[in-house]
C-alpha cells in the first residue's frame, strides 16, 4: 500500500514537471523512497533448503533435553542401587574373610543374667577382633562377666574366653591360625558370592537383577515414539558404560578380598 502511494506521488510529480519550477521538481526525496522500498523484497525472504526455522529448531532441542533428563533420572537410580549392591557384596566378602575370627560368631549368643533376664552378648558387651588372632569382649557390667563366660563355653564354637589380668571384665579368646583347607573353603565361598552378585538375576540385591530390571525400563522408554532416535542411541551407549563400570568395581572388591584371604 505504501509502495502504491509512493508510486502515485512519483507519477504526480512527473506530471507537474512541465508546470513547476525546475528547482522544485528536481527534489530527490520521492525517487529515493521509491528505490529503497522496491529493493526490500529482493534482499529478504529465501530459506535455505533442508534447514529448520529457528523456532522449530529451538523446540526440537528443548524436547531432546527433556528426554535426556528422563534418562538421567533413571541412571541416577541405577547408580544408587548398584553402589548399594557393591557395598553389600563387600560387607559379606569381609565376613567370609574373617571366618571364625568374626565377632558376629558370638554376638548373638544368649546370656541368662537372671530368671527373667536373657540378653544377647551384643546387648551387654562389645566384641572386637584384635591383632587378627584374638577376639576381645568388653562386658559393660562387671557383674555379668561370669554369665558371659559360661554362655560362650556352653556354645558349640569351641572357644575358651580368658579374663584379662588388669581388667577382669575384658575377656580374650585366642583364635587358631587359618589352615590351607580353611583358606580354600573361604575362596570357594567368596567366588560363589561374587558370581551370585554379578550374574544371578534371582538375587534381588545383586548387580545382575538390578541391571535386568533397568534394561526392561530402558527398553520401554526407548520404544516411545516421542523420544528421538539420536537420544536413544546416546543413552544406550551410556547404559552400557555404566554397567561395565559397576561390574568392574565389584570385580575389584572380589580380587582384593581374595588376595587378603590368600595372604592370611
From Swiss-Prot:
TM stretches of this protein: none
Family assignment from sequence similarity: Belongs to the RRF family.
Disulfide bridges in this chain: none
Main location: mitochondrion
One Pfam assignment: RRF
Keywords linked to the UniProt accession: Mitochondrion, Protein biosynthesis, Transit peptide
The species this protein was found in: Yarrowia lipolytica (strain CLIB 122 / E 150) (Yeast)
GO MF term list: ribosomal large subunit binding
Protein name, as recorded: Ribosome-recycling factor, mitochondrial
Key word Hydrolase present: no
GO cellular component: mitochondrion
